[in-house]
Curated annotation (Swiss-Prot):
Any Pfam family the entry gives: DCD
Species per Swiss-Prot/TrEMBL record: Pelagibacter ubique (strain HTCC1062)
Annotated catalysed reactions: dCTP + H2O + H(+) = dUTP + NH4(+)
Name this polypeptide is given: dCTP deaminase
EC number of the protein: 3.5.4.13
Keywords: Hydrolase, Nucleotide metabolism, Nucleotide-binding
Record-stated family: Belongs to the dCTP deaminase family.
GO molecular function: dCTP deaminase activity; nucleotide binding
Length: 185
């Protein structure tokens, strides 16, 4: 597997709509950067979040997930994640991953250096949709996540050949997701 460069990412974004909307360069302007980078793409988080809380003393169960476990917040500026807590968000960008590509996502250093961990599971070949982002506040302090700014870098890996079975072929349960998507079994 090889990591795609900015040239390859740009070509796939323009010719195959791999990333939409696609920002052809790094944008800063007083914001946490987003857009095309040397060997990846810095995606933005949208303005809707699900912030976990323990008001009802419930248990988080991925097989029987309850909406009592979180509150939904919409903000064009930022949200605050309580200390040692967790939130979900979604990318502004829609991703359409080609059959011979997979994607690994890592958090941006700006957030990592403030105790915010951005986690995303691997994005498989032929996935299509927005990507749900997981934020963990590992600090004993409240932490801000800025809406409509960069949060994670997507690294695109090209396989030595196309897979026998893609995410689309398997009819993956998160295929075509839009917005913050909760766990499915």
């Amino acid at each position: 597997m090889s990591v795609l460069s900015d040239k390859s990412i740009r070509k796939l974004a323009v010719e195959q709509s791999m990333i939409s909307p696609f920002i052809d360069k790094q944008v800063r302007d007083g914001k946490i950067s987003y857009g095309l980078s040397s060997f990846g793409y810095d995606a933005r988080v949208g303005d809707e979040f699900k912030i976990f809380h323990n008001v009802n003393s419930s248990i988080v169960d991925p097989k029987e997930f309850s909406s009592d476990n979180f509150v939904t917040k919409k903000s064009s500026d930022y949200i605050i994640i309580p200390p040692n807590s967790f939130a979900l968000g979604t990318t502004i960008e829609v991703f359409k991953i080609p059959r011979d590509i997979m994607c690994i996502v890592v958090g941006k250093s700006t957030y990592a250096r403030t105790g915010i961990i951005v986690n995303v599971t691997p994005i498989e070949s032929e996935f299509f949709g927005t990507v749900t982002l997981e934020f963990s506040n590992t600090t004993p302090l409240p932490a801000k996540i800025y809406a409509n700014e960069g949060v994670a870098q997507f690294l695109f890996l090209k396989g030595d050949q196309s897979p026998e079975t893609s995410y689309a072929d398997r009819k993956g349960k998160y295929m075509g997701q839009t917005g913050v998507t909760l766990p499915k079994v």
